[in-house]
């Protein structure tokens, strides 16, 4: 795509060297639009499927009035939020009150710059893609803290403190799990990590993906990912029965929609990261000798992301909410020690004759 736009502006339109630069900028903008529009639509219909799945598990119907089978319900929700008044507490900090939602949303969008959907579908293919993801997603906690403090509400501030402590705690466990993947892959480039999962003793099959040899750390990662996104059963930061929606409590209308959008985009991002790091990314679960269904493609990437997202919804509909002290105990006394211990075990495993990743 980049070469096509550069040729269009440089040769066809006769802009020379300037055309190469213009073509590069235009191609980047087009790629951003191609990523963001489907992403926002996915968020809209993820809310629909979430309500349908939870309704099914609770023997309810779910949305079924707005449009056929309730398919227009996400757009009705969007219009409702857009036209609701954005109220602000009289004693709140006006500037920070509006900066908070933006700071929560911006990192969720920016992280998609390095997520590949196959070997070619990526906005920026950099060698420190994983490090970039960890760095950029950790910034979203500042938006939560700012929103909680700027609202000048005890419930908002308590929810912000809970969310920030939980996010920072589980980032450690999740990072330890991802370090194990980097150790066996030898790279922080997502394309290289996916390619490494097609090699080894069981190369070319579903058993060569990182979820199986790293299964204990895969479980640590999945639990940490749910806690990192503040989803049930780790949603004490916005526990309706305890602190009345946490740092969201003073937000309404479009400002609340930004927090809502950030949460679901982050959830989709985690599902993409799970697919790339543990589930083989765009690699097919079938042998390549099976023809089309055995060919690596973006289709398999989307299927794996959908499976992880369904797991998120199943978890929310199944498990009760943990207490805050239980969440902290699970993170610091269970998951983090397991993560660091497995790094040592994996290092010894890789230098032993039983190395599976040669």
UniProtKB/Swiss-Prot annotation:
Keywords: Cell inner membrane, Cell membrane, Membrane, NAD, Quinone, Translocase, Transmembrane, Transmembrane helix, Ubiquinone
Reactions accelerated catalytically: a quinone + NADH + 5 H(+)(in) = a quinol + NAD(+) + 4 H(+)(out)
Location in the cell: Cell inner membrane
Recorded coiled-coil stretches: none
UniProt membrane topology term: Multi-pass membrane protein
Main location: membrane
GO biological process: aerobic respiration
Superkingdom assignment: Bacteria
GO CC terms, sorted: plasma membrane
Transmembrane parts of this sequence: 20-40, 95-115, 128-148, 168-188, 206-226, 253-273, 290-310, 334-354
InterPro entries: NADH_UbQ_OxRdtase_su1/FPO (IPR001694), NADH_UbQ_OxRdtase_su1_CS (IPR018086)
MF terms (GO), sorted A to Z: NADH dehydrogenase activity; oxidoreductase activity, acting on NAD(P)H, quinone or similar compound as acceptor; quinone binding
PROSITE patterns: COMPLEX1_ND1_2
The family this protein is said to belong to: Belongs to the complex I subunit 1 family.
Self-association state and partner proteins as the record states: NDH-1 is composed of 14 different subunits. Subunits NuoA, H, J, K, L, M, N constitute the membrane sector of the complex.
Main function: NDH-1 shuttles electrons from NADH, via FMN and iron-sulfur (Fe-S) centers, to quinones in the respiratory chain. The immediate electron acceptor for the enzyme in this species is believed to be ubiquinone. Couples the redox reaction to proton translocation (for every two electrons transferred, four hydrogen ions are translocated across the cytoplasmic membrane), and thus conserves the redox energy in a proton gradient. This subunit may bind ubiquinone.
Cited NCBIfam families: PRK06076.1-2 (NF004741)
Protein name (database record): NADH-quinone oxidoreductase subunit H
